[in-house]
Amino acid sequence: MGLYVSRLFNRLFQKKDVRILMVGLDAAGKTTILYKVKLGEVVTTIPTIGFNVETVEFRNISFTVWDVGGQDKIRPLWRHYYSNTDGLIFVVDSNDRERIDDAREELHRMINEEELKDAIILVFANKQDLPNAMSAAEVTEKLHLNTIRERNWFIQSTCATRGDGLYEGFDWLTTHLNNAK
């Protein structure tokens, strides 16, 4: 009985530390998302050369979020951030129809990596406020998300500048990371 109560207490009240890797093509909105969730406000961003790392507290989880630049010359460096990753946030510019195939290739390249085999996947279909943005269903189709088997994944429509959908995405991450560990 004591062990059960101890486990229940730890599950409900103890902070859990998790490592999140947030990637996507350049200008998808990764840094805007990171600081909107961290600070609750939109900050002026410049293209990320290298990475930003911040700790975000959400419910009972302390997320260490690594926001890695998405320019094509930087993408080969993503693999250096894979180790010990619990969750992958892949950010897509839903308005960028010309590069959605590039986004799909990068996402599938990553999920086939051995070091990321246990990471859960959250896709943020960002920039939903733009008039020609693809819906989450269309992004799901274009990224071939339904071909991802034996992996937990979820897609969330977002507008980083307004904060729409961000907390719902982190809520999904929290629920699934709590169940996984």
From Swiss-Prot:
It is a lipid-anchor. Signal peptide: none annotated. It comes from the Eukaryota. Its EC number is 3.6.5.2. SMART domains: ARF (SM00177), RAB (SM00175), SAR (SM00178). The keyword Protein transport applies. Residues 3-16 are annotated as: Important for the stable binding to the membranes. It catalyses: GTP + H2O = GDP + phosphate + H(+). Keywords: ER-Golgi transport, Golgi apparatus, GTP-binding, Hydrolase, Lipoprotein, Membrane, Myristate, Nucleotide-binding, Protein transport, Transport. The keyword Lyase does not apply. One of its GO terms (biological process) is intracellular protein transport. It is found in: Golgi apparatus membrane. A lipid is attached at G2 (N-myristoyl glycine). InterPro entries: Arf1-5-like, P-loop_NTPase, Small_GTP-bd, Small_GTPase_ARF, Small_GTPase_ARF/SAR. Coiled coil: none annotated. GTP binds at A27, A28, G29, K30, T31, T32, N126, K127, Q128, D129, A160. May interact with GTPase RAB5b. NCBIfam families: small_GTP. Small GTPase involved in protein trafficking between different compartments. Modulates vesicle budding and uncoating within the Golgi complex. In its GTP-bound form, triggers the recruitment of coatomer proteins to the Golgi membrane. The hydrolysis of ARF1-bound GTP, which is mediated by ARFGAPs proteins, is required for dissociation of coat proteins from Golgi membranes and vesicles. Regulates the transport of N-acylated AK2 to the parasitophorous vacuole membrane. May be involved in the activation of lipid kinase PIP5K. This is ADP-ribosylation factor 1. The lineage of its organism: Eukaryota, Sar, Alveolata, Apicomplexa, Aconoidasida.
